[in-house]
Amino acid sequence: MSTKEIKETPLMKQYNEIKRKYPDACLLFRVGDFYETFGDDAVRASKILGITLTKRGAGSPTETALAGFPHHSINTYLPKLVKAGLRVAICDQLEDPKMTKTIVKRGVTELVTPGVSMNDEVLNSKTNNFLASIYFGKKIIGVSFLDVSTGEFLTSEGNEEYIDKLLQNFSPSEILVPKQNKGDFKEKFGDNFHAFYLEDWVYKEDYATETLTNHFQTNSLKGFGIEELASGIIASGAILYYLSETQHNKIQHITSIHRIAEDAYVWMDRFTIRNLELYHSYNPNAVTLLDIIDKTLSPMGGRMLKRWLALPLKNATIIKSRHEVVAYFKDHQEILQKVQNQIKQISDLERLISKVAAGRISPREIIYLKESLDAIIPIKELALKSPQEAVKVIGDSLHSCDLLREKIKTTLNQEAPVAISKGNAIAAGIHPELDELRGISALGKEYLEGIEKRESEKTGISSLKISFNNVFGYYIEVRNTHKDKVPTEWIRKQTLVNAERYITEELKEYETKILGAEEKIQQIENQLFEQLVSWIATYIKPVQLNANLIAQLDCLISFTQLAIDNKYVCPQINDSFALDIKNGRHPVIEKQLPIGVPYIANDVYLDRDTQQLIMITGPNMSGKSAILRQTALIVLLAQMGSFVPAESVQMGIVDKIFTRVGASDNISMGESTFMVEMNETASILNNISDRSLVLLDEIGRGTSTYDGVSIAWAIAEFLHENPAQPKTLFATHYHELNEMTESLPRIQNYNVSVKELKDTVLFIRKLVKGGSAHSFGIHVAKMAGMPQIVLQKAEKILKKLEKNHSAEALSGTKGNKDDIQLSIFNLDDPLLEEIKEEILNLDINTLTPVEALMKLNEIKRMLSKK
């Protein structure tokens, strides 16, 4: 963001010097009671904020654009600038203007960026605001994520695909990238992220290690389990450097850094995350899985639930433990309600204690902190009495913070103000001098009321009143109708339209006493409040621990409420490779159906021995895609620790979920539907394991029929013959694939049943054994309102195609799976079919040369019209 240099007053000289240090930020420059922006910054700010754009020095050579707003409105305007993608440098007055005869000293006190903010208006309570950092190593990429508002700090490293998955899951608001890798970043991860490019020297291992160990006050990083993640360490060091550069130096709430262990969680590539619409959708109005399952009652719980959804577990012991807690609360709903009522009273503990660390917490927010800690005590007591071991462990681990709660209770007034400057935050009895000064202030105000009453009676001016303003302090206001009654010793200070204002010696004397007391009161309150905040900061770790435990409990209780509301059942996790779902339902679709319309549940059974790949045929709109998605979502929910929408589920752990559901063109990157489809499918085929779940829908539909059939056949065969033998659901409209069961024993044919009535079809949406012989595409077109003439033509062409296309021509010689022969005449163009009919109907023995030439010319004309 370039700003034309302005050579003028000392103020503008000071502005220019500061602006040069932050050329790419919008500089909010404090001038008196306003934050001002100048030049290009002013033009941008006025557009984004809808504030007036004026000129400073209008008509002079130093004329520049100017836009500003009152300093007390910063929490209204700052979020709008940040959400517009701007980096905002807040430049404050660093000294009291009354105490200096020269220009006030100013400096940037905070640089707020999309990924670095503690402003509640910028943040979303149930969503982390992650700042990410990327380091491109020789073979692997390091990544780090930090939410400065909660203190969560995570790192990992891996190949491009893994890092891409993490970026999709964590959705950082801003990503730090080395300048030398600007092109690499855009090439590998696209340009949908808000990136900021740092100098390359920041990304050095020695510098990063030193930065991290200095922050955590340790000799090494072994205790965090990340010492071998060289690329992850480098990325993490860059994040701490960036915090320092943005003037975020009070970060003692960042107490640890955790490794994201790739092998601990279910693998889902970005295609799967997108296709299943877990928490994002290309359609802004679509309902996601998170929208349905989030019954959390606290901000911490909401953020943790999203993390659990992004990173489902593979550890059967932990999964079963979560299921047991859900079952316990489901069976003890009286206790469930008591815990829910307490969690509702808990504020955002993570972000409150982070504000304590940064010194940005208000008196009222400290009261919220205390009330939240109070609400934890009954939860701790209930949990300790529980016969359920995991619940008891949570109760045992919760910190009662008795001293902290008592300290806040005795130090602050229960009705503490939103800002310390508002006064009356500190409770009585804490500081003798403060109590004395408050007494003077209160008595002084009573005395002023006495003066008002006395002077009113003495002068006979009943409407006389004593007021105060910042210009000339306390004054007596008299309406013009009583002006003639004013005593001569009163001193006139101001004339208004309907009144005049006066001061007296007595008023000035008491004003000095009162204002002196109030100024001293403010100083003492500020001092005591700062001491309290520093003392609370010693409790950062216990409060963060409580926040984490309450978040876990909130997630598990959310699962319980979900199960109660929607009749979910506990999945049985075993050591097998099988997946056995009885009457499974789609958790999102079933909630979108009109009242009274039941969701048609379906069974799905997959294993590696008898039914490894289910080939599902059926028309469009019949529900094939829903069955595929619901299978994946049931597995995901189970491995998050939730109950599932089914009659029963027995399953072995799934370690990877792959989906290719529906076509989604990546036009902006110049890729066709078919190319995108092949890229996604290649990702699956290159990463499958023996515990993978593969869901393929309409593979090959982005190309011609024969290419499509060939590719779909080859992929299905590859999955069947692969040593991993991954469990697979394969939905297709290529009915020719039903013939694969004759040569590939672990493939079974199913179809989504359709009832064919006289001239319409009824979608039953039930998965039944056996292949489907028709696609009912013309029926679907009719339901969509296709013109009758088009439908009639389609029927005619369909009959002709069905007459001439044999199954053997498509599947090749039966039983020969290695050599699929496609007949040269089985072309999917109706015109070519018509020409073929013309040629086959010719009687060559009776055809004259002229007739032959005429027929050839006719065929040529037909082709030239094509």
Curated annotation (Swiss-Prot):
GO BP annotations of the record are: mismatch repair
Q: Name one GO cellular component term.
A: cytosol
Matching Gene3D superfamilies: 1.10.1420.10, DNA repair protein MutS, domain I (3.40.1170.10), MutS, connector domain (3.30.420.110), P-loop containing nucleotide triphosphate hydrolases (3.40.50.300)
Annotated signal sequence is none
Q: Superkingdom, according to UniProt?
A: Bacteria
Claim: DNA damage is one of the keywords in the record: yes
Q: Which residues bind ATP?
A: 618-625
Instruction: State the family it belongs to.
Output: Belongs to the DNA mismatch repair MutS family.
Per its database record, what is this protein's job?
This protein is involved in the repair of mismatches in DNA. It is possible that it carries out the mismatch recognition step. This protein has a weak ATPase activity.
| Name of the protein | DNA mismatch repair protein MutS
Source organism (scientific name): Flavobacterium psychrophilum (strain ATCC 49511 / DSM 21280 / CIP 103535 / JIP02/86)
The organism's taxonomy opens as: Bacteria, Pseudomonadati, Bacteroidota, Flavobacteriia, Flavobacteriales
Gene name per UniProt: mutS
